[in-house]
Amino acid sequence: MSARAHEEKKRLRALARARASAEAPRRETHARRMIEHLLASPVWPADSASPVMAYLALDDEPDLDGLWLARSAATVAAPRIDWDRKAMDAAILRSIDDVETTRRVRQPRAHGPTVEPADLGLVLVPGLLFDPAGGRLGRGAGFYDRFLARLGPAAVTCGVCYSAQVVDRVPTEEHDARVGMILTEEGMRETSAP
């Protein structure tokens, strides 16, 4: 990555964090609306045959923990990071109480069952910024880019952010994974990602 591209992404990450921070007073309301939109959408599975990978929110991300309380028939997993391998797995999370914090990241406890990425039907992807073409600006570690490359061809990828974090264009590189949908408090929309 060029120095100019690196500086642009750094600037955009600061902008995105400021926009997310501005949404803090409405965070719970936005999260409830996002969960309602998601559970009512045709991409949410009606049974456990097509597992979903959600995420456990960081402080500035939309908090979708309510999915574990929704009593949905879907099997829901969450990212579990292996810091040594710089890899991420989808660990089944049966209860929001079965979570530990490692390096300030909430994740399912170690040694629980996992879902193969190729078996996931829907993956909810947090991000700092998204664009209508499915471009995503993450935190820069590449965990989601590497994980999404392992999904099966039928998997739906859905970026999750506040509507203020959807911008005209996110700078991307060849290795950056795109999402097929974006979920905000205003609803779900398809992107133009292939």
Predicted regions and their residues:
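N-terminal active-site beta-alpha-beta segment that forms phosphate/nucleotide-binding
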Residues: S2-D119
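Conserved phosphate- and dinucleotide-binding cores of soluble alpha/beta proteins
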Residues: K86-P194
